[in-house]
């Protein structure tokens, strides 16, 4: 016999915490409350090259559409290290691919739920992998509020956590949504953005965001933003790292799978950039197998690496960039030429 919705929800939460999730909440399915905002955001072109967001827009507007028959969503959060220092690679991508880590645990939760229910439970897991508005689910499940930097902020964890959802065909008691926005008058995230990517509080123009430019954008990084990229090779944590909620409540990384991988650990921006520029396709696949960084592909990471070396401005990096002028990807050659120009305009290296 299946437990009552309230009892089953409590059992699910206990099991999810036991699997290592840091946050768990439950919500019902229906029209997404943020759908109008999402549509307006798309209409302004703020999604840039992320055409998949437009293609899945209809399903994102109603949380019942992605997985017909589902009536409840179990929403989870998993910390990825709010106290770690900033670096050339965004915190979320330094370890194993979060999609793999989260999905495996949600699948385990699904399997346990079927045993607990005593019947087959139709369910589907989403970890940034399908047409759902994860933040909408999470706020409705009581996990946090939308910060001015557009990230979901939890009062006990900050914002450095992944969001996942398991949609199921079971009626569960829903948690109260998080109704109070607690950013107050703080605007640190808006002011700290290197490219002024926030149109207004809570609205991000992705085409100006360093995370978008170094990961999602497949073409050239516009000249107006290259210097602002600085030594950020993949992604950007600036708007989160300055947030007082992360300063006060950000937690240390406990998940072994999210510890920095060998290809990243202990390497500064210059070292990592030179190594990436020198990689052929086989070396790239070996180094970034099972990493979220593979999303940018070799050409994207090499493009970023050239920009980073140009911004660092060390003349000893010129040989690596000269070699990159013969790179098999034209976009890398172009950015390498730009980087050499940046370095050489500072004059010849000082000989001691």
Regions found by a protein language model. Name each.
Residues 302-313, 334-345:
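Structural detector for internal amphipathic alpha-helices that build alpha-solenoid repeat scaffolds
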